[in-house]
Amino acid sequence: MNLKIYVFLFCLIIIQQISAQITLQADGEGNTYELINSVLANPNRNVVEVPDCNHADFGRHITEVFDNELNKNVFQFHIHVSPDNDRCKVGVDDRQRNEIKTYGDSPENLIARNGETVQYKWKFKLSSDFKPTASFTHIHQIKSVGGSYASIPMITLTLRKSSPDRLELRYTPTNDQNTLKTLNLDELRGNWVTVKEVVKFGDAGSYSIEIRKTLTDEIIFNYSNPSVDMWQDGADFARPKWGIYRSLNNAQDLQDEIVKYADFSIEEINILSIDDLKKEAENIVLFPNPSSKQIAFKNINSQNYDAIEMFDFSGRKISIEKKFQQEKLDVSGFSKGLYFIVFIKDTIRVKVLKCYIK
């Protein structure tokens, strides 16, 4: 009997670990809304926010298609400058929306409560001639439900017409949004990119995001803040949104668009203690050492650090943001001598490696 109980508990743990990560993947043409709702909503509920009601002759505004670059089926989010609107809401004619989300009628493990840490992952691709507006074109949001600040997202990825056009990472715990970092939109146009976003929800929270080109694994955007308010007062829960939500205030700057998305993932994760992280980091090694061209890292786990920094022997920080790719560091062109490579997690230095450039 005890053995049966043990086996049952072991299987239960395995099932919980497997079900902790929820994925949404396109599976081919047809029944797209039904597929999305089967994953992100409770039975007979709807998380799809589309402009079909005002553009019925086009049909469904989220479809599926086979993508030759990824060699798999993907989602296509369609938006038209006219006549698409925001779900036929009366009096709202200055914006249009085609989004999916989680919400109160989603399974509990798809919404974020105060104190939880959640990892969101997805892929997306803009057209090679994508045109943003000077107002806003949101393609991702982390938004609260409940409380006095529910109308404004805590985190937004928005596309903006500028010189040059750019992606903006925007943040607020209240109602005063600030831009944290930007990226030239040409880095995204015509490229599949993979996004990983980790949020520790709470007044003493943390936030990180990384965007890589999917086909080359090149990091083109990253941001991390280990100590930031990630909970809006009075909120019941927080949830993600993906798709196209854009202003029509400068409609002359816009065009009909298709934004492709793939491989959505929502996973609640347990954060290791700093001592655990240091133990994990003990196994990290670099080779060859000394080197004059490229250094590779062994036993590296990106979940165990927020950032990697490099310092020369005098303590001067060396920029390596564009030199670190696919667990390899390009050191060609560096002056000869001793350098220090530092792995950081939650502002704590969990590993320091000596690196000799010859």
What are these language model-derived features?
Residues 21-193, 199-271:
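Low-complexity, Ser/Thr/Pro/Gly-rich disordered linker/stalk regions
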Residues 216, 273, 314-316:
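Residue-level recognition of short loop/turn positions
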Residues 10, 67, 112, 147, ...:
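Generic marker of residues within folded, mature protein domains
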